[in-house]
A protein has these predicted regions:
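The feature captures the beta-strand-to-loop junction immediately N-terminal to the Walker
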Residues: 26-28
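Helix-to-loop junction immediately C-terminal to a conserved catalytic motif
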Residues: 40-42
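ABC-fold ATPase nucleotide-binding domain signature/coupling loops
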Residues: 46, 109-136, 151, 158, ...
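Conserved ABC transporter NBD signature motif
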Residues: 48-56, 65
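Conserved "ABC signature" C-loop
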Residues: 76-120, 145, 161, 218-221
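Helical segment within the ABC ATPase nucleotide-binding domain
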Residues: 163-175, 187
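C-terminal portion of ABC ATPase nucleotide-binding domains
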Residues: 168, 185, 190-239
Length: 239
């Protein structure tokens, strides 16, 4: 993976995202996760081979490729318009019933019912909490019905209640879908089919949660740090 100036940002890497399964991508800040995501999206050049269903990414129309992706990021991007506009991205051929179904699947129907689909939203998500905005972003991804789901720290900015809603909606939505889940929270990855661990631009570990957690390596170190932080936070809440 290269910068526009040709500088190597990450790699060499070798892995496969299994069709219909979820792969988690973890690693410390600066490990190269963002570079990998941007490369998969077609925003960054690369050397070697990167194929999508056997077709080289360079040969694909990148705009069309991105239209097949349901994306949920760390900071939900909402547009100036109504709740309906934000979920449908302004497409007028989508029935309100479909919008409502997507909102229900994203656990957003509770607060949307209070405001209505025509509730106006500014481009800074005014009037909504971060958790509510993230659930609208999830509803948008569900309605898009992408063949590939890309989840980039989707719960990093959320409180515990909102995180529970979003993770529940995501888990239900990506069943039987091909998904890449970038996260710093390792405990929820016990049911993930494959975990990739990056450090300094390289893939240093790969496997299942149970195996990686028992091996000496970066994943076990990060997991121990995660658990210590959770225990400390629980102590603060109990105090």
């Amino acid at each position: 993976m290269l910068s526009p100036q040709g500088k190597r940002l990450a790699g060499p890497l070798s892995f496969t995202l299994q069709s219909g399964k979820t792969t988690a991508l973890v690693g410390p800040s600066g490990a190269g996760k963002t570079s990998l995501i941007n490369t998969i999206l077609g925003f960054m050049p690369y050397q070697g081979s990167l194929t999508i269903n056997g077709i080289e990414l360079r040969e694909l129309d990148h705009a069309q490729w991105r239209q097949t992706i349901s994306w949920v990021g760390q900071n939900p991007l909402l547009l100036h318009g109504t709740i309906r506009d934000n979920v449908t991205l302004g497409k007028h051929n989508i029935a309100d019933e479909q919008v409502t179904q997507a909102l229900q699947a994203a656990y957003a129907q509770e607060f949307v019912e209070q405001q209505g689909l025509d509730y106006p939203i500014s481009d800074r998500s005014a009037g909504l909490s971060v958790g509510q905005a993230q659930r609208l972003a999830l509803a948008r991804a569900i309605l898009q019905n992408g063949r590939f789901w890309l989840l980039d720290e989707p719960t990093a900015s959320l409180d515990a209640r909102s995180e529970q809603y979003v993770m529940r909606g995501l888990t239900e939505s990506i069943q039987q879908r091909t998904a890449l889940f970038v996260t710093h929270q390792l405990q929820p990855l016990q049911s993930v089919e494959q975990i990739l661990v990056m450090e300094n631009g390289l893939l240093v570990q790969a496997g299942h949660f149970e195996d990686l957690s028992q091996q000496s390596g970066l994943f076990a170190t990060m997991l121990a740090a995660n658990q210590a932080l959770q225990a400390a936070n629980k102590g603060d809440l109990d105090a």
